[in-house]
Every structure is written in C-alpha cells, then in structure tokens.
Regions:
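An N-terminal assembly and electron-transfer interface module characteristic of large anaerobic redox
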Residues: 1-439
Length: 439
C-alpha cells in the first residue's frame, strides 16, 4: 500500500533509480538505528555507495571527514541463491536476533526489503514479533523496482518510519521546531542547516527532529512535541510530506520553506519572529546583513546593469536569483523550465516577471534559435553547456545555499566573468579554446 506516489510511478515513466536504494538512503539518516537490508550483497553495496557519496565528496574536495556518511549504519542479510530458491526468512530472523544479542543493541532495527526478497515473497513483517523493550523492529517494504523509483522508496521510508516510530500523545515543548525534508545527498545540506540554526538560536528557538536527516530515534519518536514544523523545500516531495503530517498527526507547518537569497531570508525571519514573538531579534539580524548586501551589490551593478540573462533550468523556483539579477539592473529575457522527475510547476511570487517569457517543459532543440533571437549576455543552466560564442555561460545549483547572500554571490561571479578575457596571458589561445571546447 503506497498512497503517496512519485511522479514516475503516477505517470508510468521509466524509473529513475530503484525504491530499495531510496528507502535505504533515507532510513540510514536515523543515525542510532541499524538499517538491515534484506538483500544480496550487491544491492547493499550499491546503496552504501549512494549513502556515502556526500561524505566521500566532502573528504576528497575539502578534506573533511563525515563518519556518518563514510561509515553508514547498514548491515545486510547477504541473500544467496539458496535463499532465492528456499526462502530467506530464516536468514532474516537469524540476522535480527544476532543484532539484538549484541552487547549494545540499537533502539531500532529498520528492515528494508529488496527486489529479490520481494520476488520470492519473503514477508519482512515476520520480524516485527522480535521487538524488545530496548529495540523496536521497523519494516519498509520497498522491494526495489517492483515498487517504483528512487523517489518512491524515499516516500515509503518517510511514511513507514513515521507511522511506526512517532508517538502521537506527547506533550508539546514551547519554542521548539522540527525540520522536514532536507536534501540529504546535497553537499551543502549541513551547512544550510547550521546557518539557519544560528538564526533560530538568536530567536531562542530549538530544533527537535530533522526528518529525515542526521537525526536520532528519540527525536523522531518525539516528533509531535515540536510546536511548529519548518519545511526545507516546498517542492513535489515536500508538499507530499506536509500533507502527510497534517493528515496523520495534525501537525502545524510554517508557511515558508527554507529561504534562499536576501528577500526570502528577510521575509522568513520576519514571519518566524512574529510567530515566536521574536520580531525585534529578527529585524536585528536583517539589518546587520542588509548593510553588507547593499554595499556588495553597489560594486557589481555598474558591470551588470542592462545585461541580458536567459535561464534554462530544472529548478522550478528561481526567485532568489531573479531578485538578485533585478537588483543589479539586469534584463531577464526568457525563463526555460525543463521537465524534472523530482518536481513540477514553475513557482514565483515576483510581479516583476509578469512580462517575461516563461516556458515549462522546455524543448532543448529550441535553445540555439532562442539564443540567436534573444542574444543574451549570459546563459544560466544546471549543467556546463557547450561553449557559446556569443555569450557567457554559468551553472545554477539544484540545491542552492540558504541565507541572505546566495543570489548576490552568483551575480558577483558573473561580474568577475565579464571582467575577464578568454585570452588571458596566453594571448592567441582563444582560437584553440573555441576550436576544441566547442566540440
């Protein structure tokens, strides 16, 4: 039973990843639980590669070690051909008992089923009877491609863990919030959380549970103790989770998602400050950062004013960069939104873009003719495109940084790009650059 479905499952599109992998990734963020994959070694191995990707990337790029990402809390039943023929339930139960008999058993064992265990009909719910006072057994019937894509597995983990762990009858704690739906694979997730946590601390607001990101069994169990829930992303999945928690637990959600850029961050702080009677502190934070924002914007405006910007992106919310572009006097000539499996429906609260051409489900084949017709000075996209002879290109992150200066930092980069020449110190190397890079 999966009442909350991914776009791929609803539209019967080719799958993007498998449900087992998505469920494993999200479940592993319950950091003090053991995540038990009822699968062959190969399936577990692939999931561990996904789970550890952010940690490995951080280690290689910055030299920082994130043990929770590099050494995930994952075990496997290591299903064999014998299990596939005669059934793997005995193997599963034996593995669970071995974990329970360890010197320090975890508060929870989350069992996730895979394609092989689903195909042969192993019922992982058989292990529920092994729960003890110290350790709760939780099951997620993901069953790989049999159930759906990666996002479907995420949704199943979200809802299954919530229904089996969260206690409804629990006392509310004043000035406490939960954070819902952070993007766990994005490398800036922890940095974004810490930045906004600093703002919350200044307004005397504490965080209980991060659902589901680097959190604990106890904080998830006490989810309903929070006074308010903060949604990190109000996209397709974020809105599903908001709807789920409202229907299942009567949860209250803050109307704004995590803010990106100066205007969104200011509005977010003012609204949150009003809710928690901390308006003075919110205004103080905004004033401190507004001075910095305006002074830095003055430096880039002379170089960017009047420049034409064209955007081709999978992102469905762009107000943070549109605001920054408008603040420095740029002209936005076209916004092209590509079809994306994780979101749908372009969203903007800016009246300033009413006269701007916005195309959803943009056809990439129109790119060349649009560039020739609109003659943009800069093209913004999610990927590094083929070199354009007539303009500068730059990339837009799928998961931008939160806070006041996200859009500002991007337009500052554009300003530096316009100040540079491809020729640089190599003088005539521009011909070689154009010849080979444009292929």
């Amino acid at each position: 039973d999966a009442p909350y479905l991914s776009k791929n499952v609803i539209r019967d599109e080719p799958l993007h990843g498998c449900a087992f992998n998505g469920a494993m990734t999200m479940s592993s963020n319950l950091k003090d639980a053991v995540i038990l994959a009822h699968s062959p070694k190969s399936c577990t191995y692939l999931s561990i590669q996904t789970i550890s990707s952010a940690g490995r990337r951080t280690l290689f790029e910055r030299g920082n070690i994130l043990p929770s990402s590099l050494i995930p809390n994952v075990l496997s039943t290591d299903m064999t051909e014998t299990d596939m023929v005669f059934g793997g339930s005995e193997n599963l139960l034996a593995t669970v008992k071995k974990i329970l008999d360890s010197p320090e058993p975890p508060p929870a064992i989350v069992i996730v089923s895979s394609c092989p265990s689903g195909i042969i009909g192993d019922d992982i719910d058989d292990a529920l009877s092994l729960s003890t006072e110290r350790t709760k057994i939780v099951t997620v019937k993901a069953e790989g491609n049999l159930t759906g894509d990666y996002l479907q597995g995420m949704l199943m983990a979200y809802t299954s863990l919530a229904k089996q762990i969260i206690e409804k009858d629990i006392e509310k704690r004043a000035r406490t919030v939960n954070v819902v739906f952070e993007k766990v694979v994005a490398r800036n997730t922890e940095m974004n959380f810490q930045r906004l946590k600093t703002f919350l601390a200044r307004m005397n607001i504490s965080v209980n549970c991060r659902f589901l990101c680097n959190t604990s069994y106890e904080s998830l169990r006490d989810f309903c103790s929070a006074e308010l829930n903060l949604l990190a992303y109000r996209d397709y999945t974020g809105k599903i989770l908001e709807d789920f928690f409202i229907k299942e637990y009567g949860a209250s959600f803050f109307e704004k998602q995590f803010p990106i850029g100066f205007k969104e961050t200011s509005d977010w702080l003012l609204a949150l400050g009003k809710h928690f009677d901390a308006s003075d502190e919110a205004k103080s934070i905004i004033s401190e950062n507004e001075i910095i924002y305006q002074n830095r914007m003055k430096l880039v405006r002379p170089k960017l004013e009047g420049k034409k910007l064209m955007i081709i992106t999978y992102n469905h919310e762009l107000d943070w960069i549109l605001n920054a572009a408008l603040d420095c006097g740029m002209k936005i000539v076209k916004i092209c939104v590509l079809n994306f499996s994780q979101d749908e429906g372009f969203r903007s609260s800016l009246s300033e873009i009413d006269g701007i051409e916005v195309v959803e489900n943009y056809d990439r084949d129109e790119r060349s003719s649009d560039i020739k017709r609109l003659k943009p000075d800069i093209i913004l996209s999610n990927y590094e495109p083929v070199s354009e002879q007539s303009c500068i290109t730059d990339t837009i992150p799928m998961c931008p940084d939160n806070g006041f200066f996200t859009g500002l930092e991007m337009v500052e980069r554009w300003s530096r790009l316009f100040s540079k020449s491809k020729e640089g110190e190599w003088l005539n190397d521009r011909k070689l650059f154009d010849k080979y890079y444009s292929r």
